[in-house]
Amino acid sequence: VKDGKIHSIGKITGEAKDIIEAKGLTVLPGCIDTQTHFREPGSTDTEDLHSGSRAAIAGGITAVFEMPNTNPPTSTKKEFQKKLDLAKNRMYCNYAFYFGATADNANELADLKNLEGCCGIKLFAGSSTGNLLVAEEKDIETVFKNSSKVVAVHSEDEEILNINKKLIKDGDVHSHPIWRSVECAISSTRR
């Protein structure tokens, strides 16, 4: 490491100039955040790939897996490539992106096996930001059957979410776990 940057990777020779006494402390390597929402493209007023990755590094995160529920969603090879292009030379950490599963692209997911920069398929069984909901059982099964990568699931029962929407209190963040309840997640996962 020179001037705060990795200069080379290889076998370490010699002794360290500085030794840090870490007795009684917890020492971790850089961590991996497997669920980031940097909201690019679409909502760069809140955060983007550049600022989000910079914040990740400041917090000890050296790699991120970014979610596909952006605007437009990262659910086609064209949009996936656009996201890779947006990230190139702008991110401070290692990164990979999830490819968003939809009912429309479920039969094409086997083609992603060697898609560079893709860490997996994201399946939204409950609605979230964007329009990536895959609520029908037959479509969920098709996603799993055809996926050539790990499938990460946003597991919430859409029917319960819709019933619970009346529990949302505008501007009250404390209503979030009431609306998106434990029952909602367990019901979806049991399916």
Predicted segments, located by residue:
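Metal-associated gating/positioning segment near the N- to mid-region
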Residues: 25-90
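Active-site mouth loops of central-metabolism enzymes
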Residues: 34-47, 70, 93-105, 132, ...
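Hydrophobic faces of well-ordered beta-strands that scaffold small-molecule active sites
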Residues: 30-36, 64-66, 95-99, 119-123, ...
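Active-site gating loops and adjacent loop-to-helix segments of metal-dependent hydrolytic enzymes
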Residues: 59-61, 85-92, 158-190
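Short, acidic/polar
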Residues: 45-53, 103-114, 191
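Metal-dependent enolase-superfamily TIM-barrel catalytic cores that perform enediolate-based chemistry
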Residues: 121, 131-153, 157-159, 181-188
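Histidine-rich, glycine-flanked metal-binding segment
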Residues: 1-29
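Active-site gating/metal-coordination segments in enzymes
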Residues: 89, 93-142
